[in-house]
Amino acid sequence: MLDDRSAIEHHKYSQRLTELERRSAAAQQRQQKKKPPKMHVGNKIRGIKIKRYVSNGERVLKLVVLFSAILLFMLYIISPLSKITTLHVTGNHDLTKEQVEKNANIYPGRFIWGVYLARHQLTKQAIRKNPQIKDLRIKVTGPQSLQISVKENALLGIAVMNNDTYAVLADGQLQRTKNADNGIAYKRFDGHKKVLATTAAQLGKLKLAIRNGISSVSYQPTKEYPDRVIIYMRDGNTVYGDLNTIGDKMGYYPAIAASMKNKGIIDLQVGAYSYDYGSKDK
């Protein structure tokens, strides 16, 4: 009887043990499905080596491309392909293209990047050589083409002093010249260079339309008006003015001239008024 009972209990224990083993195996299978299989250490090392190799290869390629580009650019700089073949000059009115090129020392055949890198020095050099050049802008417009934009000190006219002929510029500078150009004729300024420079700087403020209407300017001081200049207009009128203020007051000339019925004198020395020739002795 005892043997039968012991056999039954042993059988039940074996069944429970089998059931537990089955559940444990099933749980392990589920967990293995959730987690990816572990990579072998050797495979990991191989993968790291491959990544490093690819990364190093990319770095080397980038360096090769960079140094190749630098080398090609350096070869281009010293090759005939970087020499100026086309040169454009813009903004010049009184100056010729050749004068601008000569004063700036820029010409076809020079290395374009050498010119560009030295553009500030070349600009200063041009201004120093020729007062008619107020400013320069140098711009690379192509592999072999360059543009020079010039800003001029306008040429107002010519003055003859002590047998020397001077070009009178809009900023008041005087430039000795051999060419008697058209423009405003400056008279009776002998021995008065500073007065001429001040007068020129004042007239340089005027709009081009007014300035082009001036035929000549004469320095004629009096006791009452020691800074008097007389301006003879191309339309037949005469303007009396102060050489220190004439640049501002001449701005009223078009309106005053339009209101006059006859040709006459416009006095801008003190205030602003006009009268016909012969109607008032001044």
Swiss-Prot record:
All residue ranges annotated as the POTRA domain in the record: 82-153
Keyword set, alphabetical order: Cell cycle, Cell division, Cell membrane, Membrane, Transmembrane, Transmembrane helix
Keyword Cell membrane carried by entry: yes
Topological domain ranges for the Cytoplasmic compartment: 1-59
Membrane topology category: Single-pass type II membrane protein
Start and end residues of each stretch annotated as Disordered: 19-41
Chief location of this protein within or outside the cell: membrane
Stretches in topological domain Extracellular: 81-282
Pfam families recorded: POTRA_1 (PF08478)
GO biological process, one term: FtsZ-dependent cytokinesis
Compositionally biased region (Basic residues): 31-41
Transmembrane residue ranges: 60-80
Subcellular locations according to the entry: Cell membrane
Role played: Cell division protein that may be involved in stabilizing or promoting the assembly of the division complex.
Name this protein carries in UniProt: Cell division protein DivIB
Source species: Limosilactobacillus reuteri (strain ATCC 55730 / SD2112) (Lactobacillus reuteri)
Name of the gene this protein is made from: divIB
